[in-house]
Amino acid sequence: MSSWTSKENINGVYIPSALLIFGTTIIKKEWIAYATALAVVLSAWKLFSNKPRKVLNPTEFQNFVLKDKTIVSHNVCIYRFALPRPTDILGLPIGQHISLAATIPGQSKEIVRSYTPISSDDDAGYFDLLVKSYPQGNISKHLTTLRIGDKMKVRGPKGAMVYTPNMVRHIGMIAGGTGITPMLQVIKAIIKGRPRNGGNDTTQIDLIFANVNPDDILLKEELDQLAKEDDAFRIYYVLNNPPEKWNGGVGFVTPDMIKAKLPAPAGDIKVLICGPPPMVSAMKKATESLGYKKANLVSKLEDQVFCF
């Protein structure tokens, strides 16, 4: 059902307008023209006010209020920030990220860091950030001090990656830790755009997701459910400290793992990389050794190997 014929518009716009006009014909027929004009104006205002509004500003920081905080583990939280109106959306293109800024005690300048929301523009009225707090992480530590009702400065969109359906035949992904967040954004967009969901996206997806311990695997339930529902999405987990009877990878992500699990170098594939800087550096070298085009210092959309 389109937004024009949604239940909300039928009950909140069309029926009240019809009742206004009908009631006027009973009371005084001469007022029908005025009642009709009033109904049109009110209906237009109602329809317009319900239309999703993109709130991000790429040039100026805006304050967003912390609405909720969900503890995932001892050092990972999901922070939910409210948008100004319940119908507002962030307006973030798939593959891009936002900048968070804060004044940190002991720092001479305002600190700015980039994060990718795990929510999307399908989620009106709020956006969610999955953040791991690091001992030396200025913004991640600042987020842990926020209380419900506190504000955070946000600017965006930002980034060179903008995913479009079928931009390549096959996407390989290598993620480490919280580097899974931009990958999840792309994965969900592809699956949402499948033919069975009314789209035309047939992109194959293979993900290598590396972590230290089993408890460090973020969003595992959601990822596993997505893979269960979509045959064209496959995950290979890698752990430094695997449990007994582990059937995934062990140690660091190796060229052999990449060769076995990700698409071979070709003109219609892309490899996405996101994780801690040492891992990203190692994966750049590994992909180049396997015949993929050398990753640039600053990634561009057209690059075969793209690093977030």
From Swiss-Prot:
InterPro entries, per the entry: CBR-like, Cbr1-like_FAD-bd_dom, FAD-bd_FR_type, Flavoprot_Pyr_Nucl_cyt_Rdtase, FNR_nucleotide-bd, OxRdtase_FAD/NAD-bd, Riboflavin_synthase-like_b-brl
Protein's pathway: Protein modification; peptidyl-diphthamide biosynthesis
Entries under Pfam families matching the protein: FAD_binding_6, NAD_binding_1
Keyword Repeat listed: no
Binding positions for FAD per the UniProt entry: 144-159, 170-207
Main subcellular location of this protein, as a coarse class: mitochondrion
Identification of the protein by name: NADH-cytochrome b5 reductase 1
Organism whose genome encodes this protein: Coccidioides immitis (strain RS)
